[in-house]
């Protein structure tokens, strides 16, 4: 594999942290989304606000924000970034919870991993809050929806609204 295709690999195939010191500092953002699929009973409990452990959606939002800030501690080759904003939305839908996270920075590398981490950990927080009600909950479809800034410019997933 060429270095340009997988920049986290050295010429000999060893993992490395990419040197971004020569890259321009630019405004960047990324939005990711995912779902927690739940039973109808669990959705009803969430809708009624009677989850025994408390407000699952509020906990998910805070967990997602915290996760975005901790991404370089969790993903070994991610750069520590100056995150200027994180917005996590956790909405109840018929199938469970839809989670969306937008992360912004002005830095040398993008924030896709921070947005993905925010969504994944927010989903884990939902499961932690409702596991006594629905042991079969599933985190699903975690993906980047959009990214902006940087050398390659803006990108948007075509198969998502």
Annotate each language-model stretch with its function.
Residues 1-57, 62-77, 83-161:
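C-terminal binding/interaction regions
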């Amino acid at each position: 594999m060429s270095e340009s295709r997988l920049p986290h690999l050295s010429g000999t195939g060893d993992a490395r942290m990419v040197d971004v010191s020569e890259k321009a500092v630019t405004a960047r953002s990324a939005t990711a989304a995912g779902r927690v699929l739940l039973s109808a009973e669990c959705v009803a409990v969430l809708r009624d606000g009677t989850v025994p452990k408390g407000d699952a959606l509020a906990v998910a939002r805070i967990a997602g924000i915290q996760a975005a800030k901790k991404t370089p501690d969790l993903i070994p080759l991610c750069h520590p970034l100056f995150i200027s904003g994180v917005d996590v939305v956790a909405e109840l839908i018929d199938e469970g919870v839809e989670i969306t996270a937008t992360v912004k920075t002005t830095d040398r590398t993008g924030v896709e991993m921070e947005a993905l981490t925010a969504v994944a950990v927010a989903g884990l927080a939902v499961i932690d809050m409702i596991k006594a009600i629905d042991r079969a909950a599933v985190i699903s479809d975690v993906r980047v929806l959009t990214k902006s800034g940087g050398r390659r410019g803006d990108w948007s997933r075509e198969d998502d609204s």
